[in-house]
Amino acid sequence: MITFIICLVLLVVAYFTYGKYLEKVCKIDTKAEVPSSRLYDGVDYVPMPRWRTFLIQLLNIAGTGPIFGAILGACYGPVAFLWITLGGIFMGAMHDYLSGVILVRNDGLSITEIVARYLGKGAGAFMRIFSVALLLLVGVVFVVSPADILSTRFELIDKGWWLAIIIAYYFIATLLPVDKLIGKVYPLFGFALVAMALGLLGVLLFGDYTIPSMTLENLHINKENLPLVPTLFITIACGAISGFHATQSPLMARCVNNERECRFVFYGSMISESIIALIWAAVAMAFFHNDGGVSAALAGHTPAWAVNEISNTTLGVVGGILAILGVVAAPITSGDTAFRSARLIIADMLRLEQRTKWKRLVICAPLFAAGVALTFVNFDIVWRYFAWTNQALATVVLWCIVVYLHKERHNYWVAIVPAVFMTYICASFVFVSTQFVGMGAVPMAYVWGGVATIVITLLMAYKILRSRKALQ
């Protein structure tokens, strides 16, 4: 229990300390004109209250990530607490906050355009294709997974109808101005997501459950089957650091009222997500403690099953409702904003303004046609690569932040250390995982990961040294 409490306190304190320090690093200007007012179009560039942009950002970046990922991460033992806490504070929240500030200072453009601006046209072109494909994949999977769950719970309605209903909702949400549907409905889901986490926190603190504290013996369980490096850092993405967040942040970067709000909206939402992930990891460890641990309990089951079991048992009838929220509403709200982000990336790439409905339709129609077609594809193999691509995207954004801070003569060490670390995680995963080279957790795999990291770091150092002169 004490490890969990310490990590929880550290996350809260970090918002008021490290988050405040990052504000000084960025030299926040409260008088600077922001995109929501300067580029107001009534569709995507719309100023909204700070509390609303925070809740929408939280729901956009969360989805099922801090729930399912944390439950799977709990298989590693209490070491998951460390990664969620330290990763959330120094990597994830920093990544979300600094990329959010950069987006606000660059007209709220899509992250792909920011990468092109700071890492070069080649990197930008790759990121455009990579990001649209990733967002399309996320959107489609978040159509299929809730449809599966709903068709199981409500057998009178066929899965095909659920697919049609969800896709129709996605299309409308992607097409409408951000304040008409997302701005009104999502804060309610955001409140519910927070309420679910707080309810489980109450159960942990005051219920008859024991959260394992971290010791040398249980620091990392299942060492033989679950190598800590790099798989833990790939498994727990949302809650620690996630590149998907950078694709979602432009939505709210176009809605903040001033630069000061960025810490609350971007750093605060990521810290909140880390707290949610920490709670779910702790709940999973405590709930399945007498069943042989999380790994044994999940054998033959999915994280969605675990959410349902935990929620119904610990929170009763209310828990059943919240379980539906966690495994249905959360992915749906991330899925539609994934499609919306894809629309914005394509619009920014084509320099196609989105004020009029027909120009939004020009992008939405083929985008959703591709999405509908992909719902009939088996994603079992492709989806295995999502976790790695998500962290690879985060790594690219971290290097982009480094270039920006170096160019602006700010303290770039806050980003370069996480960038090098995540480069090593992604590189070593390529050599260790059977999804790629498949060498396994042998010393040589880690050596090759280190060599790849050194090469990439040297290339980025060359880019950084050139960037200041090129961008002046």
Residue ranges and their predicted role:
Residues 10-67, 231, 258-261:
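Membrane-interface "cap" regions at the ends of multi-pass membrane proteins
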Residues 139-165, 173-174, 193-220, 404-412, ...:
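Hydrophobic alpha-helical segments and their helix-loop junctions in multi-pass secondary transporters
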Residues 1-16, 73-103, 112, 446-454:
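Extracellular loop-to-transmembrane helix junctions
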Residues 49-65, 203-209, 218-280, 325-334:
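Hydrophobic, membrane-embedded alpha-helices of multi-pass small-molecule transporters
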Residues 121-125, 132, 160-164, 268-277, ...:
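Loop-to-transmembrane helix boundary motifs in multi-pass membrane proteins
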